[in-house]
Design a protein with these regions (language model features):
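Short, charged, amphipathic alpha-helical segments
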Residues: 106-110, 130-131, 170-173, 195-200, ...
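Positively charged n-region of N-terminal signal peptides that target proteins for export
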Residues: 1-4
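Secondary-structure edge/capping motif, primarily at the C-terminal ends of alpha-helices
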Residues: 93-100, 119, 123, 158-162, ...
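Boundary at the C-terminal end of the N-terminal hydrophobic targeting segment
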Residues: 19-21
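Extended amphipathic alpha-helical interaction segments
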Residues: 139-221
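Bacterial N-terminal signal peptides
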Residues: 6-16
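N-terminal Sec/ER secretory leader and immediately downstream segment
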Residues: 23-132
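A cross-kingdom marker for long, charged
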Residues: 216-281
């Protein structure tokens, strides 16, 4: 008797339960979209990894030596540089899939776990990074790329939950800057108009310059942010000189040097006030 009663209760209530679940799901999506707009998280803030890979595919041969020279073990005493470094590691992963370097990709995956923990999103990314390592070990480059896509999706979700606008933008900036630096070095070493055209996108430069300009005044005055902003402005000015034309090899070489300097500023050791530390003798 009790079972029959429960059965009919479920039959009567099920449509309402389903409708409520659908409404809750729609409310959650609406809430997420509102937070994305509020935090400035849009296709430019967190560009699609798939689209980014499509652009990076032209930068061959991959400057593997420059990627390997980076200190993946680097740690920083501030969230600004930690976020930049996280984005930089993702960009390295992009290029390494093109070079098909499984061990290097595994090293990047491990570094991503460490940096994600430093940013407070480690729990979400630990499983994702482990999956990335497994695909890399098998030489499944399509799988690696898919995991990178999912990694960025997880980061975006974490940014929404943390409501940390600056971290969202700086991770994106770090990825763009590193990808730009590697692309500029590749183009300077093996120039082609197709590569040079990709480097000339001033709109994305304007976007990140605007993001840097909205940082807290105290952070904007630090050596690291001042130097980074200055280099990006110089890169933007050189790219704008070409206007609708393709940048020449000479222009690309200048941009390469500025991109290297910008990445150096992003990864430089600084004190608690954001001042560059002097090299120890």
């Amino acid at each position: 008797m009790n079972r029959v009663f429960v059965f009919w209760v479920l039959i009567v209530c099920l449509p309402t339960m389903v409708a409520n679940a659908q409404e809750d799901s729609e409310l959650q999506r609406s809430s997420d979209e509102h937070m994305r707009e509020e935090l400035g998280v849009n296709p430019i803030t967190t560009p699609s990894i798939h689209d980014t890979l499509k652009q990076l595919e032209v930068f061959r041969p991959v400057p593997v030596a420059l990627i390997d020279a980076a200190n993946r073990e680097a740690t920083f005493n501030n969230r600004f540089q930690t976020a930049l470094h996280f984005g930089s590691l993702v960009a390295d992963g992009f290029l390494l899939t093109l070079a098909e370097r499984p061990q290097a990709i595994q090293d990047v995956g491990k570094a991503l776990i460490r940096q994600s923990r430093a940013l407070g999103v480690g729990e979400r990314l630990t499983k994702r990074s482990k999956s990335l390592l497994e695909h890399s070990d098998k030489g499944d480059w399509a799988g690696v790329r898919q995991e990178l896509v999912r990694t960025q999706e997880d980061v975006e979700t974490s940014m929404l939950e943390l409501r940390d606008e600056e971290m969202a933008h700086m991770i994106s900036l770090g990825g763009w800057l590193r990808g730009f630096q590697l692309g500029a070095n590749c183009t300077a070493d093996a120039y082609s108009p197709a590569k040079a055209r990709i480097l000339g996108n001033v709109e994305i430069m304007d976007y990140f310059l605007d993001r840097l300009d909205t940082l807290h005044p105290r952070l904007k005055k630090t050596d690291m942010v001042t130097a980074l902003t200055a280099r990006v402005k110089e890169i933007r000015a050189l790219a704008a000189e070409a206007a609708d034309k393709t940048m020449t090899r000479e222009q690309v070489e200048k941009i390469r040097d500025l991109a290297n300097a910008a990445e150096d500023a992003a990864t430089a050791k600084v004190d608690e006030e954001g001042r560059f530390e002097k090299p120890k003798n």
